[in-house]
Amino acid sequence: LSRYSSLRYKALTARQKGARGLIVVSGPNSKVVQQLAPMTFDASLASSGIAAISVTDAVGDKLLAGTGKTLKELQDKLDNGDLMGGIDCKGTLAANIVIQQEKKKGRNVLAVLPYGAEPDPHVAPLIVGAHIDHLGSSGGSNSRAKGDEVNKIHHGADDNASGVGGVLEIAQWLADLKKQGKLTLKRDIIFAAWSGEELGLLGSNHFVEAYAKMIKGDANAKLTGMFAACLNMDMIGRFQKSLVLQGLGSSSLWAKEIEKRNAPIGLPITTQNDAHLPTDSTAFYLKGIPTLNAFTGSHADYHMPSDTADKIDYQNAAKITKLMGLIARGIATADAAPDYITMEAPKNS
C-alpha cells in the first residue's frame, strides 16, 4: 500500500474529488522526527488550483475542536483498519502560501507502428505505454529511504524499467510480425515512454491535454473515440502471488479479452475494476479512453535505492509482457475499439 500512502496520491485524489486545498498532519502515532512535511511537493499541482499546507498535531487538534474528536482517536481507528468518511469541521481557515517554482524540461518518447504505409489520424490508434522516469541520484521527497540512503542512486529496476522493457519487447515483436506479413493491423499502435510520472503524471497529462488542444481547441476536452485504448505497464518485475490488472471497469471488453489471451500463458491474475490509479493510465481514462494497467504489487524496495535489477523476476515479467502483447495485438487487429465506461472514483479512496 506504500504507493497509495504518498502525498502525491492523496493530493491527486483530493483534486479529482474537487478539493480546493489539502491540509497535511502527521498525527501523534506516526512518531516522526519533524511533524511538518518537507517544503517540497508534487510538481503536477503547480497550476492545478489546489493549495497544500502542513500543520503540527497541535494545530490539527484545534481544527477538530467542536467535532468531539481528536487526532489521536481518528488515527487509532485508521491504524486499526476502521474506515471512515469525512468530518464536518466548522469555521474558516486562512493561509498565506508562497510557491517557488523550479522549471525543468522532460521528454516523452513515442514511436508509431502504422497499420498502413503511413500513420492514419482518421482511425483511433492504440496506446501501449510505461513511464520512463524514476527518482534519480537522490530520491527527493518521493524517496522512502532514510538518512544517508536518500542520497544514493535510486535505480528503479521495477519502477519502472520493467514496464519500459515490456513496451520495447511488445514493439519489437509486433513490428517483426508486420514486417514478415504475419500481422494485419486495423489501426496504428503508439508506443510511449512517459516522462514525469513520479512528479505527478506530467508527461502523460501533457500528451492528452496537448492532443485535446490540437484536435478540439480545448485542453480540457474529452477524447472519447480518439484513441482505441491505453495499455499501461507500471512495475511488472516483482511477481508475487498474481498479476494485478487494473481498470477492468473502464470497458466491458476487458474481462473476456484477458481470459482469452491468458489461456495459453496461465498467469494467476487478480483484477480490479477501478481505473483511478496513481499511474499514467489515469490521464487517459479521465479523458474518456478505456485503460488497462499491469502491476505486480508494491514491495519493501519501492522508491528505495535497493530497487535493483538483480531482484527482477525475469521469467514472470516475460509472461506478463507476452500477455499484454497479445491483448495489444487483439485490439490492434479488431475492427471495433473497446467501449468506454464512466466510473466514479471510489468513495473514501
Task: Report the location of each language-model feature.
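Extracellular/luminal Protease-associated
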Residues: 1-51, 114-115, 122-125, 134, ...
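Soluble metallo-hydrolase cores and metallopeptidase-like ectodomains found primarily
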Residues: 46-156, 169-172, 176-181
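Loop/turn elements at helix/coil->beta-strand transitions in domains of secreted/extracellular proteins
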Residues: 17-22, 89, 122-126, 185-189, ...
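Acidic/histidine-rich catalytic neighborhood of metal-dependent amide-processing enzymes
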Residues: 3-5, 9, 13, 30, ...
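Extracellular/periplasmic catalytic domains that process cell-envelope and extracellular macromolecules
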Residues: 15-17, 46, 86-87, 102-105, ...
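His/Asp/Glu-rich mid-to-C-terminal helical/loop segments that flank catalytic regions of hydrolases
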Residues: 165, 172, 300-344
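Metal-dependent peptidase/peptidase-like ectodomains
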Residues: 49-73, 194-299, 313-317
